[in-house]
A protein has these predicted regions:
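Catalytic domains of carbohydrate-active enzymes that cleave complex glycans
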Residues: 501-661
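Feature activates predominantly on carbohydrate-active enzymes
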Residues: 87-91, 95, 99, 141-352, ...
């Protein structure tokens, strides 16, 4: 038995009297502990671009001196990225001011600025000043999200080739200058005073070009910018996955174009307009009729052109993904494809490639007509349910350059890693898609059946994100908590982990954990860390004891029962929160909102144990006591605007059952 498990068992044994753990754990009949975390090796990636970020020396040239600076920020005001440049420049100035008390002037445009080696400038964009200074753009492929930061003379040059690149460049420059980090909305830390200008020669590209955090479901634009997530969504449709009936709605086309739709039926009512849909999916061969297939592709291409050029010119991804039904068309043409390749995906790939051929041709013509770069537009389909497994590979099934597969790993046990035996099928699934072309990832780090039971992926996610990067992922999405703005169980910490690890999966988990708990809860962090450590250690123990209910699969039906959550353990964790609240009392005197912010962060974490107590341990209290506890829980969920008990259930039935509605 490995050292880590011995430590966890020691924790359990010491606390067995108060926590009653002996009565709530289930042992593996074989006597074998899965013990995945204890034998888990690190898999650092080597296919990333992070140059010049280690051991950056100072130039010895003063940057902030005695509460003042000679530096100015120049923001280029021409070109397709001028708005992103202006925002980055303003963001840099604002946070240098927050960190040092010094506000650097932002000059809008470079027309009146002349370069000299003695000039003290932070130049964002500006081809003119780059050329004058001899700034050489990197030959590395930085894509649309990468950037370059270089010290030239007394000045600093910041360059990117995309709006998101300028966003990330601003964060990177602030990290070097003032030790910037963002833990949450309006929660910033600075660990440097900006005294001297560093000697920078940085070239970076985030490990995932697209980083969509749904841990908190809706990520406000300022929060996304400050943490380095994509603002809004990079997708061009509201649903990022199941979109085929968005492009070819059965209500419009089904009756007159039966060849476009599957002959497998499901008969469901469309949520949007109450229309009874008969077809389960599209038919990706149009029942063997090429002329009909071409009509389908042209119609979808028309809509993609509108989305990418008019509605969402700042977005680059559009999914043409099958409906959320695990059936496929079984016409003779489709079955011939399945018989040959083993998957209906072999029909979907040429279907999507054909759409892409039309779209890319039109985008190129549009760019030539308007004398501008070709708008990057990537079209995705899903590896999900009937298309979970890759077809047999041959060259005819290679993706076009702007086509990719969005791997939706809904069967994965996310409390383990892809390298653990329990996930071997999902690991092979992902690896088998690699020869085809671009891959994108959609992870289900969520307890979809109950949002108030922790989703214990905090440590395992590090290796799972590395796995995605090693396997050439361009996008990372964590489904998180769908349809609710926040939940308890340290989801704010998970979101912070995502913000840092999706940029560089090689970051050290221990360092990130320390940064978060040392700062996010103020002086109460020491008790919140105790809560977190005990909660995750307990769940690790339950998982590694072979308890399938704690394996991190998206639907964990049985984790929310009284037997798994002894009341004394829950009360202990709530007590930690009470102690944390006492530790922050002194911040009331600041009278600047600090106490209120810290209070709310700690209060939010009480909701998980209180929920379990109120719902599953009610019989241990008098009617008056439990009614009061439930009313207090209700009031706090209203305060935080928490609407959903699970992915598909609001709190309404619970409130009615408790007599609160």
């Amino acid at each position: 038995m490995k050292k880590r498990l011995l430590q966890v068992i020691a924790f359990v044994c010491v606390t067995v009297t108060s926590f009653l753990l002996c009565s709530c754990g289930e042992k593996n009949d074989s006597g074998n502990n899965l013990d995945a975390e204890n034998i888990r090796a690190e898999h650092k990636v080597t296919n990333s671009l992070h140059k010049g970020v280690e051991n950056i020396p100072d130039t010895g040239k003063p940057f902030i001196v005695d509460g003042a600076s000679e530096y100015k920020i120049v923001a280029s005001n021409y070109g397709s990225h001028k708005n992103a440049v202006a925002k980055a420049a303003g963001f840099i100035s604002s946070h240098i001011n927050s960190a040092t008390g010094v506000a650097l002037e932002v000059i809008d445009g470079d027309s009146d600025i002349e370069w000299s080696s003695s000039a003290k400038l932070v130049v964002v964009g500006s081809e003119k000043l780059q050329q004058a200074a001899g700034f050489r753009k990197t030959a590395d492929d930085i894509g649309l999200a990468g950037y370059q930061i270089q010290t030239v003379g007394n000045s600093v040059f910041v360059w990117a080739d995309g709006d998101n690149g300028y966003n990330l460049a601003a964060l990177a420059l602030l990290r070097v200058l003032v030790g910037y980090d963002c833990l949450d909305l309006d929660t910033y830390i600075y660990t440097k005073d900006g005294s001297y200008l560093p000697e920078m020669d940085i070239v970076e590209r985030p490990d995932f070009d697209y980083r969509v955090d749904q841990t908190l479901y809706t990520v406000a634009a300022p929060r996304a910018y400050s943490m380095g997530f994509n603002q809004g969504e990079p997708y061009m449709t509201d649903d990022p996955c199941h979109t085929t009936f968005y492009f070819l709605p059965p209500k419009v086309y089904e009756s007159e174009n039966k060849d476009w739709f599957s002959n497998q039926r499901c008969n469901f009512v469309d949520d949007q307009d109450n229309y009874l849909v008969h077809a389960a999916q599209l038919c990706y061969t149009a029942h063997g009729k090429p002329e009909e297939l071409k009509k389908m592709q042209e119609l979808i291409a028309d809509q993609i052109m509108y989305l990418t050029l008019e509605k969402y010119p700042d977005r680059n991804l559009v999914t043409v993904g099958q409906q959320d039904e695990d059936v496929v068309c079984n016409c003779d043409s489709c079955m011939a494809v399945v018989d040959k390749y083993g998957s209906i995906a072999a029909a979907i790939i040429p279907f999507i490639n054909g759409i892409d051929d039309i779209v890319q041709s039109r985008l190129k013509a549009y760019a030539e007509e308007h004398n501008q770069p070709v708008k990057e537009t990537n079209i995705l389909f899903l590896s999900y349910q009937s298309t979970r497994f890759a077809p047999k590979f041959d060259d005819s099934l290679k993706f076009n350059d702007h086509v990719g597969v969005l791997i939706c790993s809904s069967k994965t046990r996310y409390s383990y890693t892809f390298w653990d035996d329990i996930n071997v099928v999902d690991k092979e699934q992902t690896e088998n898609w690699q020869p085809f072309g671009n891959v994108y990832y959609f992870y289900y780090e969520i307890n979809s059946n109950n949002y108030f039971v922790p989703c214990n992926t905090f440590r395992a996610c590090v290796e799972n994100y590395r796995f995605a990067k090693i396997n050439n992922g361009r996008l990372m999405t964590s489904m998180g908590n769908w349809k609710t703005p926040y939940t308890s169980s340290f989801t704010a910490f998970k979101s912070y982990l995502n913000s840092r690890l999706w940029f560089n999966v090689n970051y050290d988990y221990v360092d990130l954990e320390k940064t978060f708990f040392d700062n996010y809860y103020g002086d109460g962090g020491v008790y919140m860390k105790k809560f977190f450590d005990e909660m995750t250690s307990y769940m690790d123990y339950m998982r590694d004891s072979g308890n399938a209910d704690f394996n991190g699969v998206v639907v964990n039906e049985f984790t929310y029962t009284a037997k798994y959550w002894p009341i004394k353990m829950l009360q202990r964790w709530n007590n930690y929160c009470d102690l944390a609240l006492k530790k922050i009392e002194k911040t009331k005197a600041l009278n600047d909102g600090t106490y209120e912010a810290l209070h709310d962060r700690i209060l939010l974490e009480t909701l998980f144990p209180r929920y379990i107590i109120c719902k599953y341990h009610a019989a241990k209290f008098s009617e008056t006591e439990i009614a009061s506890m439930r009313k207090a829980f209700y009031d706090d969920t209203q305060y935080f605007n928490l609407t959903h008990e699970s992915q598909y259930e609001t709190f309404e039935s619970l409130w009615k059952g408790w007599g609160l509605k």
